[in-house]
A protein has these predicted regions:
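Non-ligating segments of multi-cofactor redox enzymes
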Residues: 1-239, 245-246, 252-278
Length: 278
C-alpha cells in the first residue's frame, strides 16, 4: 500500500510534495518508514546478489525460479523497474533503499549535531563516482568466473550486515557496515554516491528513463546556479543540466524551482513586474 501511494505522489504530485512547508519532515518520515518497514521488518533490501545470480543462471542455463521465492523483494524490484522508466535510478536510490535511508537519516542527525562535513572537490567527486562502475564490473566478472562465490563477493555491500542481520555479525562485518554509516555523517551518502554496485546498476537501468522529469528554465545554469550549489549529490552541471544517472530524486531542486522566494529567476521576474507596476 505504501509503494502504491508513493509512486503517484512522486509521479503526479511531486511539485505539491516538494512545495509542502513540511516537506523535509515528510521525507524524513518516509525514509524512516522505508528503513523500518521495507528494511528491518520486510527484509526487502535489494542487493547486487540478485542480478549477479541471474547472470550466473543465464550463463549456466539454470532456473530463475529463485526470483519468486521472496515476493516482498520482488515487489520492490518491480517498483524500481517502474522507476527506471519514469525517473531513472532516483526512485529506488532516493526513496526505497533501506540502507540509503539509513545513511540519509544519519546525515540528518549529524547536521543536528553540527558535525563538520568533508566533501570531495568537484573534480574528485566526478572521479570517485566512477568507482562504483568498476566495482560492478568486478562483481559481474566474478559472477561469471566463480558463481559459487557470489555472496562472498557481494559483501562489498554492507546491506546484509546493517539491514538483514541488524549489525549482529562478526565484528569485521559490523565494523565495516558501521564505518559506512559513520562516514555518511561527515560525507553525505558516501557509499551510495561512490561505491555501491547496485547503485551503478540502477544508474545503468535508469538509461531507460522516458522523460526529463525535473523542470528547468532558460536561466537555470546561466546565470542561476542555486540548484547546482544546493544539490548535495552533485547531479547538476554548471549549465543547469541534470545528470539523471546521479540524481537521487530528493526533490530539493524542484522545491527551489517552484518557490518564488528561492528561485532567482522568479525573484527577478517579480521585481521586474513591480517596477513596471510602479
Amino acid at each position: 500500500l505504501g509503494l502504491t501511494l508513493l509512486l503517484p505522489a512522486l509521479g503526479f504530485g511531486q511539485s505539491l510534495l516538494a512545495a509542502h512547508p513540511r516537506f523535509p519532515a515528510i521525507r524524513a518520515a518516509i525514509l524512516l518508514t522505508v528503513l523500518v518497514f521495507v528494511g528491518f521488518w520486510g527484509q526487502g533490501q535489494l542487493s547486487i546478489v540478485t542480478p549477479l545470480a541471474v547472470i550466473a543462471a543465464l550463463r549456466d542455463g539454470g532456473s530463475l525460479a529463485f526470483l519468486v521465492y521472496d515476493p516482498f523483494s520482488l515487489m520492490v524490484w518491480a517498483a524500481a523497474g517502474v522507476g527506471f522508466l519514469l525517473w531513472g535510478r532516483g526512485l529506488f536510490c532516493g526513496w526505497l533503499c533501506p540502507f540509503g535511508a539509513l545513511q540519509d537519516l544519519a546525515d540528518r542527525l549529524a547536521r543536528r549535531l553540527k558535525l563538520p562535513q568533508l566533501e570531495p572537490s568537484p573534480v574528485w567527486d566526478r572521479r570517485l563516482k566512477r568507482v562504483k562502475y568498476l566495482v560492478l564490473a568486478a562483481l559481474v566478472a566474478g559472477a561469471l568466473v566463480r558463481p559459487a562465490d557470489i555472496h562472498t563477493f557481494a559483501e562489498v555491500e554492507p546491506f546484509k550486515t546493517a539491514i538483514t542481520t541488524y549489525f549482529l555479525r562478526d565484528w569485521p562485518y559490523a565494523l565495516y557496515a558501521l564505518g559506512w554509516v559513520g562516514l555518511s555523517m561527515v560525507t553525505f551518502k558516501g557509499f551510495c554516491r561512490y561505491v555501491c554496485p547496485l547503485g551503478a546498476l540502477m544508474a545503468i537501468g535508469g538509461m531507460l528513463r522516458l522523460r526529463r522529469w525535473i523542470p528547468r528554465r532558460d536561466a537555470c545554469g546561466s546565470p542561476c546556479q542555486l540548484c547546482r550549489v544546493r544539490c548535495r549529490y552533485g547531479a547538476i552541471e554548471k549549465t543547469g543540466t541534470i545528470g539523471y544517472d546521479e540524481c537521487f530524486q530528493c526533490l530539493d531542486c524542484v522545491t527551489i524551482h517552484d518557490d518564488p522566494r528561492q528561485c532567482v529567476p522568479l525573484i527577478l521576474a517579480a521585481r521586474r513586474q513591480e517596477r513596471k507596476a510602479a
